């Protein structure tokens, strides 16, 4: 049976892992076994946090909208309810951007929501 020489592949595999761990502190950037373990954890964290980022931004947008809405004298949930009743299809990202950058347009949307809430029948 022929002898299998794997030195090149093994060195490449180790080099790739050590390059991925190049910014880590201490042994995690120099020793292959520690670096491999840390790279695996890092990849898992980055996968998890790419999913979590979406919720984080949604929460940030809601906080910004709520702060701007309360400055206009209406709460966040009443604003969203009024915009839905008025048929205004603006997502939270756009609303938060308007609240920060264009207060006049945001105030107009708040007025639209108030009008829709005052016209809407109340359920009892």
UniProtKB/Swiss-Prot annotation:
SUPFAM superfamilies: Ribosomal protein L20 (SSF74731)
Cystine bridges: none
One annotated GO biological process: ribosomal large subunit assembly
Region forming the signal peptide: none
Record flagged with keyword Methyltransferase: no
Recorded GO MF terms: rRNA binding; structural constituent of ribosome
Cellular component terms per the entry's GO annotation: ribonucleoprotein complex; ribosome
Pfam families, A to Z: Ribosomal_L20
Keywords, sorted A to Z: Ribonucleoprotein, Ribosomal protein, RNA-binding, rRNA-binding
UniProt similarity note: Belongs to the bacterial ribosomal protein bL20 family.
Role summary: Binds directly to 23S ribosomal RNA and is necessary for the in vitro assembly process of the 50S ribosomal subunit. It is not involved in the protein synthesizing functions of that subunit.
PANTHER family: 39S RIBOSOMAL PROTEIN L20
NCBIfam families named in the record: rplT_bact
Record-given protein name: Large ribosomal subunit protein bL20
Species whose genome carries this gene: Acidothermus cellulolyticus (strain ATCC 43068 / DSM 8971 / 11B)
């Amino acid at each position: 049976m022929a002898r299998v020489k794997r030195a090149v592949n093994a060195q490449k595999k180790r080099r790739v892992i050590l390059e991925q761990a190049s910014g880590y502190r201490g042994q995690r950037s120099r020793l292959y076994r520690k670096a491999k373990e840390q790279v695996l954890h890092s990849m898992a964290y980055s996968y998890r946090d790419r999913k979590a980022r979406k919720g984080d931004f949604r929460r940030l947008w809601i906080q910004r909208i709520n702060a701007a809405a309360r400055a206009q004298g209406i709460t966040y949930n009443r604003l969203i309810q009024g915009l839905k009743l008025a048929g205004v299809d603006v997502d939270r990202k756009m609303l938060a951007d308007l609240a920060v950058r264009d207060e006049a347009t945001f105030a107009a949307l708040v007025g639209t929501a108030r009008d829709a809430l005052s016209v809407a029948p109340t359920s009892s």
